[in-house]
């Protein structure tokens, strides 16, 4: 091993001391005339000559005899060897400034020179990604409704909607609700505006606007309700419904009306209440054109046109379109509560 790679110490050997980052770097000398590096350290030279030669990469030959403090730039070739990644020319970093490194009394070893390491701590600069790189990153399989990054080239489905290519969203032209997929908008139009509920329960005849809603409803007839309220004994099919029901007993109403301040247990109830202030009636009957603020009122109204009576009295078999009418019939005609 060349002698210039070793740092002598009177207290302990080098393997007993902490190593510095500079210890692992090879020492080179730089000739400002030829702009070339040569390995420092020769077996024939004394330690004093080795120390002087170790400083030759910092102090040019013209100035090392005068020992006048002067700032000098570290050559770009050495900078490119020390910095990983892009070269110094590509990073456009100015030369390192050497400060007060020519005083031989204040310099115990070659790796404790006084030049500034600030330039090595500069972060990399960021540039705009090229169009070629952007197109390469955007290559991926197209999903069912088109890319989630790029708008679909095909025209949107006609569900009385307005399509925004900038945000990949679908707007209902009647109530301005926004949906992320055309399927979601289709279900919304069918439920809220068209009044069409093509999915009917074979047991009780209740209709739904979506197949998933019908599937969840059929579980009521086929399975036992397993979630029971311990305060009133009422049972529910889903735990989420029980959690909403418990708000009634705790009198927790986290959703206030922005117009009158009235509070509600559920956000949907608050939204239905706001239609009283705004006068909005988004649910319209397709037969007679009558509009309603709540979809449940539209469902009940549509039974007048179809003649469907899902609620029947178990004593006289008389049918009713509304549950409240059946309850009133039981109280008045059969004295039941």
Curated annotation (Swiss-Prot):
Predominant place of localization: nucleus
Keyword Zinc carried by entry: yes
Chain intervals annotated as zinc finger (C2H2-type): 170-193, 199-221, 227-249, 255-277, 283-305, 311-334
Region (SNAG domain): 1-20
SMART domains: ZnF_C2H2
Domain notes: The zinc finger domain is essential for erythroid expansion and acts as an activation domain whereas non finger domain serves as repression domain.
Function statement: Essential transcriptional regulator necessary for development and differentiation of erythroid and megakaryocytic lineages. Alters histone methylation by recruiting histone methyltransferase to target genes promoters. Plays a role in heterochromatin formation.
UniProt-recorded name of the protein: Zinc finger protein Gfi-1b
Organism: Gallus gallus (Chicken)
């Amino acid at each position: 091993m060349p002698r210039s790679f070793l740092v002598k110490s009177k207290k302990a050997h080098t393997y007993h001391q902490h190593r510095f980052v500079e210890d692992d770097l090879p020492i080179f000398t730089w000739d400002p005339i030829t702009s070339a590096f040569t390995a420092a350290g020769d077996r024939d030279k004394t330690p004093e000559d080795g120390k002087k030669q170790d400083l030759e990469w910092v102090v040019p030959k013209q100035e090392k005899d005068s020992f006048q403090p002067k700032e000098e730039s570290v050559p770009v070739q050495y900078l490119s060897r020390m910095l990983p990644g892009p070269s110094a020319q590509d990073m456009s970093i100015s030369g390192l400034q050497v400060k007060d490194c020519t005083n031989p009394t204040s310099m115990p070893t070659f790796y404790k020179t006084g030049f500034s390491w600030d330039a090595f701590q500069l972060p990399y600069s960021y540039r705009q990604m090229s169009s070629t790189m952007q197109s390469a990153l955007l290559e991926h399989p197209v999903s069912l409704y088109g890319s989630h990054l790029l708008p679909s080239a095909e025209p949107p489905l006609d569900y009385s909607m307005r399509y925004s290519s900038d945000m990949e969203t679908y707007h209902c032209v009647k109530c301005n609700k926004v949906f992320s997929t055309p399927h979601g908008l289709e279900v919304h139009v069918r439920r809220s505006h068209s009044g069409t509920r093509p999915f009917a329960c074979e047991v009780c005849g209740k209709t739904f606007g979506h197949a998933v809603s019908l599937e969840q409803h059929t579980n009521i007839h086929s399975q036992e309700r397993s979630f029971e309220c311990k305060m009133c004994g009422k049972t529910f099919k889903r735990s989420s419904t029980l959690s909403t029901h418990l708000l009634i007993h705790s009198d927790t109403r986290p959703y206030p009306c922005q117009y009158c301040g009235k509070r509600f247990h559920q956000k949907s109830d608050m939204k239905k209440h706001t239609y009283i202030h705004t006068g909005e009636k988004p649910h319209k009957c397709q037969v007679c054109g009558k509009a309603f603020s709540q979809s449940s009122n539209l469902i009940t109204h549509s039974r007048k046109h179809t003649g469907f009576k899902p609620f029947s009295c178990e004593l006289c078999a008389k049918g009713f379109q509304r549950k409240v009418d059946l309850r009133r019939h039981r109280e008045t005609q059969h004295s039941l509560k």
